[in-house]
Curated annotation (Swiss-Prot):
This is Trace amine-associated receptor 7b. Disruption phenotype: Mice lacking Taar2, Taar3, Taar4, Taar5, Taar6, Taar7a, Taar7b, Taar7d, Taar7e, Taar7f, Taar8a, Taar8b, Taar8c and Taar9 show no visible phenotype or behavioral deficits. They however show an absence of aversion to low concentrations of amines such as 2-phenylethylamine, isopentylamine, N-methylpiperidine and cadaverine. Coiled coil: none annotated. Keywords: Cell membrane, Disulfide bond, G-protein coupled receptor, Glycoprotein, Membrane, Receptor, Transducer, Transmembrane, Transmembrane helix. One of its GO terms (molecular function) is trace-amine receptor activity. Belongs to the G-protein coupled receptor 1 family. Residues 69-83, 144-166, 234-274, 334-358 are cytoplasmic. Specifically expressed in neurons of the olfactory epithelium. Residues 1-47, 105-121, 188-212, 296-309 are extracellular.
Length: 358
């Protein structure tokens, strides 16, 4: 992400000849074109490794989130307002794996953008939009979990399908409008005309964002993050108190089984814990990138290119992490995967399969 800083010595030739990570030689992205960007290709070994690592991340994001969406949408037992939020979150991560990561793989490994100027801007819009869409979804999911844990008996009447739909609509609309309007209006480049001119070359896809918009980007990340941290802190305090109450009651009464309220509370606490881990994974993935964007915006591109690329791909890999988290913590998801992969979902009445242990 490019930013404006008067004290930083921007030189057009040095920008066009800057290399990506450590490379073996210097070439042009388009040998027969004037104003072609310079590329510094990797040797075959590192290239193969990078393609494998980045390609695996993209494939995992696509296939893993597709399994999440298929599981929840197919099996009626999983149809709930909370799970509809999870499906929508998986859709955003799926689109990152489908429309962003494959093209970023080529750009990161080859050091050039070969997909045209139009898709460069569209690719960046997808990147920005789906990132913020995930943030907003996770924020709403944390609020949903708070309601479920704090008052599990009245939760179904408070967080309905209609409320879930409004949260989903808000997340997609706001993130899409922000991402596309920011880049297609050129507001991000205001005051950076000289820098944009210096960065422009055939085979490049650099995003120039001025300090004001970098700060706005960070706020759009920070505010939902603070909400999530606050809400999950309250959730775990409530969960701890509930666990102590249940233990105290168990000692006072010899019950053969837990009450309905206790079972519901236990289930909601487990769901909150799992989704809390998903939120923590998201923050650990994206926070370094956003901090780095602030540093670069106000200190003038002090981050080495290879460090920036690493931070970007750590953030991208978050789109592949949620399905792994669900698979590790949710027995119903593992069972759903087996039914989908084995083709048993094609059988009649498979949508009514019981995925929860008795």
């Amino acid at each position: 992400m490019a930013t404006d800083n008067d004290s930083f010595p921007w030189d057009q030739d040095s920008i066009l000849s800057s290399d990506m990570f450590s490379a073996t030689s210097t070439e042009l992205c388009y040998e027969n074109l004037n104003r072609s960007c310079v590329r510094s290709p990797y040797s075959p070994g590192p290239r193969l490794i990078l393609y494998a690592v980045f390609g695996f991340g993209a494939a995992l994001a696509v296939c893993g989130n597709l399994l999440v969406m298929t599981s929840i949408l197919h099996f009626r037992q999983l149809h709930s307002p909370a799970n509809f939020l999870v499906v929508s979150l998986a859709c955003a991560d799926f689109l990152v794996g489908l429309t962003v990561m494959p093209f970023s793989t080529v750009r990161s490994v080859e050091g050039c953008w070969y997909f045209g100027e139009s898709y460069c801007k569209l690719h960046t819009c997808f990147d920005v939009s789906f990132c913020y869409c995930s943030i907003f979804h996770l924020c709403f999911i944390s609020v949903d979990r708070y309601i479920a844990v704090s008052d599990p008996l009245t939760y179904p009447t408070r967080f309905t399908a209609f409320v879930s739909g409004k949260c989903i609509t808000f997340s997609w609309l706001l993130s899409t409008i922000y991402g596309f309007s920011l880049l297609y209006t050129g507001a991000n480049e205001a005051g950076l005309e000289d820098l944009v001119s210096a960065l422009t070359c055939v085979g490049g896809c650099q995003l120039a964002v001025n300090q004001s918009w970098v700060f706005i980007n960070f706020l759009l990340f920070l505010i939902p993050t603070l909400v999530m941290i606050t809400v999950y802190s309250k959730i775990f305090l409530i969960a701890k108190q509930q666990a102590q109450n249940i233990e105290k009651m168990s000692k006072q009464t010899a019950r053969a089984s837990d009450s309905y309220k206790d079972r519901v509370a236990k289930r909601e606490r487990k769901a909150a814990k799992t989704l809390g881990i998903a939120v923590a994974a998201f923050l650990l993935s994206w926070l370094p990138y956003f901090i780095d964007s602030i540093i670069d915006a106000f200190l003038g591109f002090i981050t080495p290119t290879y460090v920036y690329e690493i931070l970007v791909w750590i953030a991208y890999y978050n789109s592949a992490m949620n399905p792994l988290i669900y698979a590790f913590f949710y027995p119903w998801f593992r069972k759903a995967i087996k039914l989908i992969v084995s083709g048993k979902v094609l059988r009649e009445n498979s949508s009514t399969t019981n995925l929860f242990p008795e």
